[in-house]
Amino acid sequence: MIREERLLKVLRAPHVSEKASTAMEKHNTIVLKVAKDATKAEIKAAVHKLFEVEVNDVRTLVVKGKTKRHGQRIGRRSDWKKAYVTLKEGQNLDFIGGAE
């Protein structure tokens, strides 16, 4: 059993993009920014506990940070982890429904 304290730290924020909204409409999949060390089991448990929905599948990927310049200084943005969480049939979770 994963501790509740850890579950609250796993999910960072919803990832809002055109691709994410299309995935929600067509495949009932939400896209989340998650902790870089989070496992698929932790992500599934956190979504189930916090949003009270049934999770069907979790797919993850690490987004590599881009190299950025500010004048002569060269820096790099941090890598971050993204999770595609597919919900079971009949389950619904809408982050941006009221943002019109």
Swiss-Prot record:
Keywords: Ribonucleoprotein, Ribosomal protein, RNA-binding, rRNA-binding. Gene3D superfamilies: 3.30.70.330. Pfam families: Ribosomal_L23. Signal peptide: none annotated. GO terms for molecular function: rRNA binding; structural constituent of ribosome. Coiled coil: none annotated. The keyword Ribonucleoprotein applies. GO terms for cellular component: ribonucleoprotein complex; ribosome. Belongs to the universal ribosomal protein uL23 family. Part of the 50S ribosomal subunit. Contacts protein L29, and trigger factor when it is bound to the ribosome. NCBIfam families: PRK05738.1-1, PRK05738.1-3, PRK05738.2-4, PRK05738.3-2. One of the early assembly proteins it binds 23S rRNA. One of the proteins that surrounds the polypeptide exit tunnel on the outside of the ribosome. Forms the main docking site for trigger factor binding to the ribosome. This is Large ribosomal subunit protein uL23. It comes from Sodalis glossinidius (strain morsitans). The gene is rplW.
